Amino acid sequence: SDITVAHVPGAFELPVTAAAMARSSNYDAVICIGAVIEGETAHFEYVSKEASDGIARLSVDTGVPVIFGVQTTYTTDQAFARIGHASGYAEAAVEMANLLRTLNDA
């Protein structure tokens, strides 16, 4: 298959895993999918921000599209309700990989 799935322990670990994949030259795009659900501490804000910043920085640093598919929600129900949008992540990955290939070939 042309798809590799890598499971990580949490959203905080997504950027380093995505970086390894993007820098390997084995992938045209990387999609990070997960959920960070607010708890009773500020941990939610820290994890969400670091995951978001790290993933965004990777696209620029590596030139490989890294798609942010991490849901940041207040409840588990909200996270499950949004999972239906996941096919859009694959579409964005293909679109960006094709666009960057076209720009690099120009």
Task: Name each model feature, range by range.
Residues 2, 38-42, 77:
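Short coil/turn segments at secondary-structure junctions
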Residues 1-7, 68:
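Short beta-strand elements in bilobed, periplasmic/extracellular small-molecule ligand-binding domains
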Residues 6-14:
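Active-site glycine- and acidic-residue-rich loops that bind
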Residues 8, 34-36, 70-74:
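Short, ordered loop/turn segments at secondary-structure junctions
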Residues 13-54:
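Glycine-rich phosphate-binding loop
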Residues 44, 49-106:
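C-terminal binding/interaction regions
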